[in-house]
Regions:
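Positively charged, low-complexity/disordered segments
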Residues: 144-146, 150-156
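C-terminal structural segment of proteins
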Residues: 1-141, 145
């Protein structure tokens, strides 16, 4: 590998600030795709921001009639969640079939969705479930129309 700055973010704002001034900053979720890509020198970020320290991005909970899965929730956590097994059994089963135990215990749903990883077919499952994905903007814009984040149906 090569030299880069590493930051372990403690909040979304901290992660965004860590990317300020980066020419090729990358966000690290589980690292199942990014780290091998960096080792092969196919990606060479000048700043690597680890999201593992952001507790608000982890976990599974029910809010009204919705199941909310945080981006930093691992495949194993999705697979083993009693709530997901009860409410969305197909998603629990999908998560249990991803990779091997090491990948399931480290890889995250957010990393797989953001990377559109074909070996973890969450995007197709999200479309099939008519899920809503909430994102966070990672740039600043002078336009007042831009928001801090956005919500979009997965079928959009």
């Amino acid at each position: 590998m090569y030299e880069f700055d590493y930051h372990k973010a403690t909040s979304v704002d901290d992660a965004l600030k860590s990317l300020t001034g980066a020419t090729d900053g990358k966000l690290l979720a589980g690292g199942m795709t990014l780290l091998p890509t960096m080792k092969q020198r196919l990606a060479s970020p000048d700043v690597l921001v680890d999201l593992a320290g952001i507790d608000g991005m982890k976990g599974i909970r029910k809010e009204g009639d919705q199941i909310v899965v945080g981006a930093m929730t691992t495949h194993a956590e999705v697979n083993l969640s009693a709530l997901v097994q009860k409410e969305i059994p197909a998603l629990a089963e999908l998560a249990g079939l991803i990779g091997d135990p090491q990948v399931r215990n480290r890889g995250t749903i957010g990393g797989s969705v953001a990377n559109a990883d074909p070996s973890a077919d969450y995007p197709a499952a999200l479309v099939g479930l008519n899920a809503t994905v909430t994102t966070c903007l990672l740039y600043t814009s002078p336009s007042p129309r831009d928001q801090r984040g956005s919500r979009m149906p997965s079928s959009a």
